Amino acid sequence: MAKAAEQKQNPTVASAEAKLDIRDVVNTAITYGEDNRHGGGKRNDVAMFVLRAMCMAVSTVAVTLMVTARETSMTTLYGFEFQLHAVWSLSDSLIYLVVVSSATVLYSLIQLIISGTRLMRKSPVIPTRTQAWFCFVADQIIGYAMVSGGSAALGVTNMNRTGIRHMPLPNFCKSLGFFCDHLAGSIVFALFAFLLLAASSLLDVLHLSRHR
C-alpha cells in the first residue's frame, strides 16, 4: 500500500518540478531578452551621439568652405582681358546652402547636447515614442533640405566649370580655381551630412520599434 501511494505521489511531484523548471526557463529568457534590448539600446544611443557629433562637424566644414569662397582673378575673352570677382553671396543657390547648413549645425548641436547629457545620466537618449517620432521627422526634413541645397549649389558649380553651351562663355573655374574648389568641397560635405542624417533616421526607426 505504501508503495502504491508513493507511486501516485511521484507523478504529482514530477509535474510540479516540471512547472517550476518551465517557469525558470521563461524567466531566464525574459531577463536575457531585456538585457539584450538594454545593451542594444545603449549601443544605439552611443551611435546616435557619434552621428550627431559628426553631422555637426561636417556641416560646420560645409558652411566654412562656402563663406570663404571668394576670389578675384583675370580672364581673357575674345582677346580682351576682364577682371572676375566671385563671391558666394552673389548666388541665391549658394546662400540657400549656407542657410540650410547653418540650420543643420544648430539642430545637430542641440541634439548633441541633449544626447550627451542623457548619456552622462545613464538614461535613454530617446526615452519616449513621441520624441522618437519628432527626431525622425526632424532628421528627414533637415536631411532633404541639405540634399536640395547641395543639388542647387551643384548646378551653379557645374555651370562655372563647363560654361554655358548656348553662349560662348569660358570655363571660369580655370581662372577661379580657389573659388570653385571651395564650392565643390562645401557641396561634398553637405551631401555627407545628408548621409549622416539618413543614418540617424534609421536609428530613430529602431527606437520607434523598441517603444511599441
From Swiss-Prot:
The transmembrane residues are 46-66, 94-114, 136-156, 183-203
Residues listed as glycosylation sites in the UniProt record: 160
What's the protein's topology in the membrane? Answer: Multi-pass membrane protein
UniProt keyword Transmembrane helix present: yes
The answer to whether keyword Cell membrane applies is yes
* Extracellular topological domain: 67-93, 157-182
Q: Which InterPro entries does the entry link to?
A: CASP/CASPL, CASP_dom
Q: Name one GO cellular component term.
A: plasma membrane
| Segments in the Cytoplasmic topological domain | 1-45, 115-135, 204-212
Give its localization: Cell membrane
Keywords, comma-separated and alphabetical: Cell membrane, Glycoprotein, Membrane, Transmembrane, Transmembrane helix
Family of the protein in this entry: Belongs to the Casparian strip membrane proteins (CASP) family.
| Subunit comment | Homodimer and heterodimers.
Put simply, this protein is called: CASP-like protein 3A1
